[in-house]
């Protein structure tokens, strides 16, 4: 049998975060070759991660990075809040955020190359150490030159679970910050009415038409009634149409008009939703 030193076991543990026995057994299987042992443990980690892939991931955090011409927002999920607030998971989220900072989609983010192979491989290997399913669930890239980033903790003992990136033009940074906070709490899906997909609007119109018709409303006024009822949809889902959370007497559109700001785009993630 190959003589395995505790120094090699310790080195392997430090590199991969695995247990003493797993490290020792991998070194034995590799004939004492540390790099071969690393590959053995990585392969085992990837296989064990595959077994966990179907398990629900409703906890986790959001993390962001900001640059001169773009900002990125990512949601890294796990199974329990115990893991979500662990140092190892937090370190993983920071590493992933650094690695994917130039990606333009979730697919390209997962394919970014790193020492572990790819970001997807890195996450799978860390999932094996953490003992939970871990997933990079969402990723967004927001283009622009001025950004307001807001990260919100839903509980003081947890990492940020709501994240917003707002790209804007103008110089009222304080109001931009307030609007980013508004987005975090009001959860709009679209910037303007024109951004709502026509298919969604048409389905909503058809539904409201049938509801109004069922209520006995005259056929000739149904279009006006439906358009009036669509205002509620806009208030719920369109940023520019929403009432400002700091002053519900004005809409976000009016706030922007008064301050000379223009929202270019935004991204918002809430863990598990």
UniProtKB/Swiss-Prot annotation:
Under InterPro entries, the record lists:
EF-Ts_dimer_sf (IPR036402), Transl_elong_EFTs/EF1B (IPR001816), Transl_elong_EFTs/EF1B_dimer (IPR014039), Transl_elong_Ts_CS (IPR018101), UBA-like_sf (IPR009060)
PROSITE patterns attached to this UniProt entry = EF_TS_2
Keyword Cytoplasm attached: yes
Start and end residues of each stretch annotated as Involved in Mg(2+) ion dislocation from EF-Tu:
80-83
Per the record, the similarity remark reads: Belongs to the EF-Ts family.
Q: Which GO terms describe its cellular component?
A: cytoplasm
Q: Which gene encodes it?
A: tsf
Q: Which HAMAP family match?
A: EF_Ts (MF_00050)
Q: Does the keyword rRNA-binding belong to this entry?
A: no
Tell me the protein's name. Answer: Elongation factor Ts
Q: What does this protein do?
A: Associates with the EF-Tu.GDP complex and induces the exchange of GDP to GTP. It remains bound to the aminoacyl-tRNA.EF-Tu.GTP complex up to the GTP hydrolysis stage on the ribosome.
Q: Which UniProt keywords apply?
A: Cytoplasm, Elongation factor, Protein biosynthesis
Q: Which GO terms describe its molecular function?
A: translation elongation factor activity
Compartments it resides in: Cytoplasm
């Amino acid at each position: 049998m190959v003589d395995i030193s505790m120094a090699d076991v310790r080195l392997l543990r430090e590199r991969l975060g695995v247990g003493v026995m797993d490290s020792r057994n991998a070194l034995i299987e590799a004939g004492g070759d540390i790099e071969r042992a690393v590959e053995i443990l990585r392969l085992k980690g990837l296989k064990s991660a595959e077994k966990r892939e179907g398990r629900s991931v409703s906890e986790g955090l959001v993390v962001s990075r900001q640059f001169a011409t773009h900002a990125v927002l990512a949601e890294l999920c796990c199974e329990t809040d115990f893991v979500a607030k662990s140092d190892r998971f937090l370190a993983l989220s920071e590493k992933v955020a650094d690695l994917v900072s130039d990606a333009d989609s979730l697919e390209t983010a997962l394919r970014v190359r790193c020492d572990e192979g790819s970001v997807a491989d890195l996450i799978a290997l860390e999932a094996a150490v953490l003992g939970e399913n871990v997933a990079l669930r969402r990723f967004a890239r927001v283009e622009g030159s001025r950004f307001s980033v807001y990260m919100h903790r839903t509980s003081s003992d947890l990492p940020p679970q709501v994240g917003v990136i707002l790209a804007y033009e103008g110089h009222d940074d304080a109001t931009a910050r307030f609007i980013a906070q508004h987005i975090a709490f009001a959860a709009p899906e679209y910037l303007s009415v024109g951004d709502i997909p026509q298919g969604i609007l048409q389905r909503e119109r058809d539904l409201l038409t049938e509801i109004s018709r069922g209520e006995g409303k005259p056929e000739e006024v149904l279009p006006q009634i439906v358009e009036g009822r669509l205002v509620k949809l806009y208030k719920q889902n369109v940023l520019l149409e929403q009432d400002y959370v700091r002053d519900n007497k004005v809409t976000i559109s009016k706030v922007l008009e008064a301050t000379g700001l223009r929202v270019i785009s935004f991204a918002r993630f809430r863990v598990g939703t």
